[in-house]
């Protein structure tokens, strides 16, 4: 019987072959060699991702394509978890890059016998700024603050299978945005041990179109859906001051776009 890999990277993918190739190269370059990468193709229509993975000629790459009638990032993430052979599950979007020791650190940080999630610092980069810069704030975990805003950057997360199973349901299919926030909120309520790790584990690619007004409107609607489905009590955004680092408070309260994104539409003084 084959021994399961120490770490499984979970990679939902759709088109963007060059970015996926770079993401997989960052897996292949890991200092820990005992890993697998589970790539779930969410109906790519302008790229042959299966052929791309074949050309890499690495048996640790595990590819599947969603069936007709299936689709969406939540379904792709759930399928990746289901196919993963390791008890340590590491988030990697198809356009992001692992740092070389990420798998080794996740092996050290996660105990498969426990329901645990860790999140690290991330480095923000783009095509125009390939070196990038660290995301400025790493907020220590606060369950009370997570009820109000999502301070966990999804590309920097890793968790045990026990943590994923703790809420009783994985990523919910009704979400095409904020699906990570919904899951992490339910994990926290289910008693998962969540911890910030003050290390850079991943580089998070920022796209030019990622901050458009239309996207922010859609994301705000998804955040409100998370709050309603999870019966989060209405709150004034200023309440984050009781739990958040001063720099995070400034980022959310002094920036009109961020304030609009995270404000609770249900709150009335």
Model feature map: region roles:
Residues 48-49, 77, 98-105, 128-129, ...:
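Acidic donor-diphosphate engagement hotspot in glycosyltransferases and nucleotidyltransferases
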Residues 7-19, 23, 30, 40, ...:
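A conserved hydrophobic helix/loop-capping motif in glycosyltransferases and polysaccharide synthases
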Residues 101-132:
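Conserved donor NDP-sugar-binding/catalytic core segment of glycosyltransferases
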Residues 89:
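Short aromatic/hydrophobic "clamp" motif used to bind/position activated sugar donors
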Residues 5-8, 26, 36, 182:
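Cell-envelope/extracellular polymer assembly enzymes that use nucleotide-activated donors
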Residues 67-84:
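Glycine-rich, basic loop-to-helix element that forms the pyrophosphate-binding segment
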Residues 140-223:
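Conserved nucleotide-sugar donor-binding catalytic segment
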Residues 24-67:
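Acidic donor-binding segment of Leloir-type glycosyltransferases
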């Amino acid at each position: 019987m084959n021994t399961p890999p120490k770490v499984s990277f979970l990679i939902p993918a759709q088109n963007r072959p060059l970015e996926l190739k770079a993401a997989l190269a960052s897996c292949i370059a890991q200092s820990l060699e005992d890993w697998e990468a589970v790539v779930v193709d969410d109906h790519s229509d302008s790229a042959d991702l299966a052929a791309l993975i074949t050309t890499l000629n690495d048996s640790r790459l595990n590819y599947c394509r969603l069936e007709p009638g299936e689709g969406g990032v939540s379904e792709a993430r759930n399928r990746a978890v289901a196919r993963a052979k390791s008890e340590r599950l590491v988030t990697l979007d198809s356009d992001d890059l692992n740092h070389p020791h990420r798998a080794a650190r996740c092996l050290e940080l996660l105990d498969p016998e426990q329901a645990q999630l860790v999140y690290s610092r991330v480095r923000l980069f783009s095509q125009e700024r390939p070196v990038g810069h660290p995301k400025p704030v790493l907020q220590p975990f606060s369950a009370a603050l997570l009820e109000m805003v999502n301070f966990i950057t999804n590309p920097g997360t890793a968790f045990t299978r026990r943590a994923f199973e703790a809420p009783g349901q994985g990523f919910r299919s009704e979400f095409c945005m904020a699906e990570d926030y919904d899951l992490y909120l339910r994990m926290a309520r289910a008693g998962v041990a969540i911890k910030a790790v003050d290390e850079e584990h991943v580089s998070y690619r920022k796209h030019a179109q990622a901050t458009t007004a239309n996207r922010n409107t859609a994301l705000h609607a998804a955040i409100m859906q998370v709050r309603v489905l999870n019966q989060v009590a209405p709150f004034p955004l200023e309440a984050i001051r009781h739990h958040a680092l001063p720099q995070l408070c400034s980022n959310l309260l002094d920036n009109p776009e961020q304030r609009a994104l995270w404000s609770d539409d249900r709150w009335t003084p």
